[in-house]
Amino acid sequence: MGKAKATMKAVGSGLADIGTVIGVYHPAEFPVWNFSNTPFLISDAWVGMRTWYELRNTTPELNKETDRQKIMILFNNTTGPVQLLMAKKAVTTAAGLKGMKIRATGGWTTLFKNLGAAPVKIGFGELYAALDRGTIDGTVNYTPYVKSYKHYEVASHLVEANMGQLLGYGGAINSKLFKGMDKKLQDILVKTSDEYMDVYAKNYISDAVAAKKAMIAGIDGKKVTFHTLSASEEAKWKAAAASFRTQWIAKMKKKGVDAEGFIAKFETIHNKYKKIVAEKGYPWSN
């Protein structure tokens, strides 16, 4: 057993065979992969997982990062849409965020800082206590997690801002271990990992709907009120997040990475999966 931030090194060193690696914990090691954590990049869980899985299978820059850490990503994961959970007061405007202590990570730190909030770094496991004590006013969160971690007991407002997803997140295996496996076993792992993403996305989407319904109705007397952003406010929030992409492009150019080419490829694949959902629905709905 190890802490989440230690998983990458544990798997790479062989201390662990397989583990969940979260790119946002390792920005220096996974600068290309962390583009996936850009606010407002992708809102659909299945589309996001599939987009980044295909990108990884077709983009050398992504695999060079994991090769250096002696790991291989078997499947891409997701937190689902990033929302804003507020303890006592709903905030649906940029003006209302000024001075608010908001727990954020990755590109969302940039977003909330630009909106005038005070970003705070706190581990996800510490959120319940931080919300309860008033250490923070709110946090980025994910609808099913608000229910499963019982954050609804200490926070009563959830703003469905749909600020993208944390997609730099996946299941990793030690590279040497995988390469030493029989081809048949390798194929089973790859096939199972591919199937997992569809199952995970299906369950995530249904769990999000069920969690929202339960929290609106109330759980043990605790209710959560759901809010949305107006179109004009959403535009302001997106504008506040734009500098994250600009900064990422500049960093990639310094590293010799064709950032614009990478983004163009990302957008082509992203549009491919959006089109599939629009025209055919999800794989499990057919």
Question: Where do the model's predicted regions map?
Answer:
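N-terminal secretory/targeting leader peptides
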Residues: 1-49, 57, 61-286
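An acidic, glycine-rich surface segment that forms the CoA-thioester-binding/catalytic face
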Residues: 53
